[in-house]
Amino acid sequence: MRWRSPIRGPWLTSMFALPLLVGLPVVAFTGLLDRLAYGREQAIPAADAVGGLQLPWWDWPASPAWLFRLTEGLHVGLGIVLVPLVLAKLWSVIPKLFTAPGRNPVTLLERLSLVLLVGSILFLIVTGLLNVQYDYVFGFSFYDGHYAAAWVFLASFALHVVTKLPTMVRSLRGRSLRTELATPLAATRPEPAHPLVAPDPDPPTMSRRGALALVGGGMLFVAALTVGQFTDRLRSTALLLPRGRTTAPDSTERGGPNDFPVNRTFVASGIAPAAVGSAWTLTLTGGTAPVVLDRAALAALPQHTAELPIACVEGWSTAQVWTGVRLTDLARAAGVTDPETAEVRSAEVGSPFARSLLNRGQTVSPDSLLALRVNGAELSPDHGYPARLIVPALPGVHNTKWVVTIGFSRAAPR
C-alpha cells in the first residue's frame, strides 16, 4: 500500500501528539476518579475488580457538591472533543502500521505499544460514544469492558511516550510553528526523509496549517455540540443530547420545574403506579423498631432546600433546586442519632441501581436529602415521585428514585 500525502511527517504527527500528551491523561484520570465515585460498596458491576485490576478505595466525598459533575464532564466532554485529534494522529502514523517492525527489540517494543495504543483507544472511543447514546450493542458490560481497556490504554500510552517522546521533541524543534502557519499551500513541501514521509508524494491539496486548522475546527465544532450536555444555559445547543433537549410531555410543561434530563423514566422502571400512589409509605430502619411515614408525615418534618447537580455517566449533568428532608433528620426519626451509613432502596425491582449505599460523609452531609420537591414543584414521576434521594457529588444513577426504604447503621463507639 502506498501513502502519498506530502504533509505527513514527524513534525505534523508531533503537533497532533502534543495536546494529546496532556489531554488523554486528564481523560483517563477523571475516568478512574469516576469509577471510584461509584464506590465498591454499591455492589454493582461498575465497582467490581476486572481481571484483578482493582483501584485503591476511599470514601468518595460529598463536598464540593459539583465534584462528580466536574470529573464526569471532563471525562466525557474532553474525551469527545479529542476524537478529531485522535483520528488525525492515527492518520498521520498509519504508514507505520503497515511496515514490518524488524527484529530490533526497541522497534518491536515501539510497534507493540503502537498496536495496543491504537486498539485500546479506538475501543474506548467507540464504546464511550455508544454509552453516551445509550446504545449497548456490544454484548458485554460497558463498565467492565471500558475499565479493562483503560488499563491497556494506560500501559501502552506510557510505553509509547517513553519510546517516542525524544522523537517528538526533536521533531518539534526541527521546524518552526510560526513558519508553518505562514506557509501557503503553494509553498508546502514534504518534510525531510523519514519513515512517515512519502518517498513519492502527490502534489499537496492542503497545507500543514490547513490540516491543523481543519482538526482544530473539528474539535471546536464537536465542543459546541457537546458543551450543552453539562451546561444548563446552553442545553439548547446540545444537538447530540441522547435524551433530547426537553423532557416535558407536552408544550404546556416545556420549561417547567420538572423539564430537565432524566436517565430512567418511570415507565422504564416497570413500577406499578399503585406502588407510588396515595398508599405509598417510607420505612426507616436501624433503630429499635421500623418507623413508617407517609408523604404527609414527611412533608411535616423540617424541610431543607439546596441547589445540587445530578451528573450521569453518559456525560450529561444539570443543577436544580431540591427541597426535602435531610437524611440526618430521617436517621433521628428512625432512632439513629449518629449514623455511619445509609442503604436506600427503590420500589423498582430487578435493577442493579435500585439500591444505593451511602458512606458516612454522604449520609451526614447537611445537603443530603430525601427530596419531595424540585424547583418549588412536586417531583414528577420520571424524577422520582413520591420521594427520591439527592446527595452532593454522588453519581446520578445512585440518587435513587421512588424510594421506599432507608436503613441506617450506627457509628461505632469512638
Spans of features found by a protein language model:
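Membrane-embedded alpha-helical bundles that constitute the cytochrome b-like, heme-associated redox core
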Residues: 1-246, 260, 385
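Structured, non-membrane catalytic/scaffold regions adjacent to prosthetic-group chemistry
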Residues: 230-236, 242-414
